[in-house]
Amino acid sequence: VVFHINQREDVEGNGYAVYLWDIAPESFADSIGVAQGTSADLTAYDGNTNTFALYGTTDTFSPLAEKVFDIWRYGQSAYIPSVAQMRLLYAAKAVVNPIIEKCGGDPLPDETNDCWYWTSTEVKGQQAAKAWLYSLGSGAMQETPKIQEHRARPIITLND
């Protein structure tokens, strides 16, 4: 479901669409102590680049990135959104949820205990240990150890 149409020349693609279902809880990494090469920039729309960095890291394994790449079998080049991309999704939630439901998908949750999702953005200064969780219930962010398991909601970039 399309949730953002890009108006900026400095951002890749024509917009973003969100996947209809969550990815079951997975850890960002199977161990801590390794910066996985993702951005720590909270304003960057770089989830695609970050997801490739997670997938390509050889010093540790990313169960989360592996699950996202499993989606590629169906011809969708999905990735884990960055913090900035999650902010856009959160802002559009009221508009996209009814469409997600009509398509048979799982709406983005509001419940406090059920609304936290991984982003692909690592925590600045703590890249070896933490990444950001994002609440689709409130728009809040939480520094989280990479070895914890949480859900993700993949997105894709729309191109010409």
Feature annotation, model-predicted:
Residues 138-145:
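Carbohydrate-recognition loop of C-type lectin domains
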Residues 1-78, 115-116, 127, 145-156, ...:
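Extracellular adhesion/carbohydrate-recognition regions
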Residues 54-78, 83-136:
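An exposed tryptophan-centered "aromatic clamp" motif
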